Amino acid sequence: MTTAAVFGSTGAVGGQILATLLASDAFSSVKTVSRRLPNAQSPKLQTLEEGDITKWGGLIASLSPKPSIVFNAVGTTRAAAGGIANQWKIDHDLCIENAKAAKEAGVKTYVFISSGGTRGFFSRYVPYSKMKIGVEDAIKELDFEQAIILRPGLILQREKPKAALLENIVQNLNKLGQGVQDMIGQDQTVIGRAAVAAARMAEEGKAPSKYWVLEQADIVRLGRDEWKQ
């Protein structure tokens, strides 16, 4: 049985990761670290509420039993953070600090929810893309026993859409064919399931590489087409 910890469990994808972990018999214990407690409840769930995000990384070593897998689904927007500088502190600095703390604590598998399109020629100069690239590169350099990076497209079916009009347009693209929508956006549940499925494969020694990047097609395949509870 496996123990996992989730950062960002109150967000769209993080919440789906948490729900999937709690529903899976493969995980005996699930921990969360967040500024506010998640709504989920389960006998195997242990929640830690910490308003000071600079303390999050240090809490990993205090978790018992120690998680073998850590999921990082932390993310915010420029508007919610109050500017690009504050967003950088969360989407870049905090994520790297948590990854370093996980490595020091002996975590075997680290799963990071990044974003699709960040490595494009023009997008790499966009601040948001630079944040994600910085975190991805830092995780790779930390040399975890297994690192998994998910690069989803537009996140769909969120309870509180961040770009309601755009998300609604992409959501309706399935009328032209599911494959059309899949190239642009993925359901939050599918992304969460893909993250857990990939982590389970890594635990079973079935990951295709030590540093495994899942693009949008991979996310759809693992989180929907091949998904098994």
UniProtKB/Swiss-Prot annotation:
One GO CC term on file: mitochondrial outer membrane
Subcellular locations according to the entry: Mitochondrion outer membrane
InterPro entries: NAD(P)-bd_dom (IPR016040), NAD(P)-bd_dom_sf (IPR036291)
UniProt record, GO biological process: import into nucleus
Keywords: Membrane, Mitochondrion, Mitochondrion outer membrane, Transit peptide
Pfam short name (any one): NAD_binding_10
Recorded topology in the membrane: Peripheral membrane protein
Transit peptide (residue range): 1-45
Family the entry assigns: Belongs to the FMP52 family.
Name assigned to this protein: Protein fmp52-2, mitochondrial
Source species: Aspergillus oryzae (strain ATCC 42149 / RIB 40) (Yellow koji mold)
Encoding gene per record: fmp522
